[in-house]
UniProtKB/Swiss-Prot annotation:
Stimulates cellular proliferation (hyperplasia)and mobility around infected cells to promote rapid and efficient spread of infection. This effect is beneficial for virus replication in vivo, because poxviruses replicate possibly better in proliferating cells than in quiescent cells. Acts by binding host EGFR, inducing its dimerization, autophosphorylation and leading to activation of several cellular pathways regulating cell proliferation or cell survival. Coiled coil: none annotated. Induction: Expressed in the early phase of the viral replicative cycle. This is Pro-vaccinia growth factor. GO terms for biological process: epidermal growth factor receptor signaling pathway; positive regulation of cell population proliferation; positive regulation of mitotic nuclear division. GO terms for molecular function: epidermal growth factor receptor binding; growth factor activity. Disulfide bonds join C45-C58, C53-C69, C71-C80. Vaccinia growth factor interacts with host EGFR and promotes EGFR dimerization. Glycans are attached at N34, N95. The gene is OPG019. It comes from Vaccinia virus (strain Tian Tan). Keywords: Disulfide bond, Early protein, EGF-like domain, Glycoprotein, Growth factor, Host membrane, Host-virus interaction, Membrane, Secreted, Signal, Transmembrane, Transmembrane helix.
Amino acid sequence: MLINYLMLLFAAMIIRSFADSGNAIETTLPEITNATTDIPAIRLCGPEGDGYCLHGDCIHARDIDGMYCRCSHGYTGIRCQHVVLVDYQRSEKPNTTTSYIPSPGIMLVLVGIIIITCCLLSVYRFTRRTKLPLQDMVVP
């Protein structure tokens, strides 16, 4: 029900924006017959909620009975009583990507190890090819 109400509200906003821009659009929206649509989905608590939330706004949700807190930035908890640590806030940022870029020193060490390994392999192959078998050797 709430989703249908939000979709109708969104459609009405789009139609109003077209009407404001001079483009005329004629459409009919279905009427909502449910009486609960007059009550906003979320509303502030009022005087009975003063002091309930320590660092935020006290709200009533239409679908859920009771008071709830909408915490200010940097606070969390049922009554917004806990401070969010700085490191925790950094890790919760959306769309953060961590990429590992090896330092130039590490890259030089790896390239050096590869070059030394190639040199040792070529020396080993060269000496193995040039060795004479024991049977062909002449002892004086």
